[in-house]
Swiss-Prot record:
Protein name: Regulatory protein FanA
Gene3D superfamilies per record: 1.10.10.2690
Keyword match Transcription regulation: yes
Protein's job: Trans-acting protein involved in the regulation of the biogenesis of K99 fimbriae (FanC).
GO BP annotations, alphabetical order: regulation of DNA-templated transcription
Top-level taxon of origin: Bacteria
Keywords, ordered alphabetically: Fimbrium biogenesis, Plasmid, Transcription, Transcription regulation
Amino acid sequence: MRSFNKDEYLFREKLGYLVKGMVKARCFQLLVELSSIRSSRGIYALEDYFVKGRDLKEVCNEHDITPSYVTSLLRKLQEVNHKVIDILPYYRN
């Protein structure tokens, strides 16, 4: 059985969850465009986390934002990703 690190464990509940360092840059850009996230600090922090695979603490320090704020943004982006996955079957048929 695969063990999850702390970051992955938070977002493993649904099929298709975003994983730190595993999101393609273009996919990330599209998800941000679909989301309500507009803070440039927040967007750069999320990009460092999801695309570049940097640790949450490191990202918070570099972008001068709190871990709780980044976590709320992570959840928002995860929700957008899940909505995209949920709607995909309607476009495939």
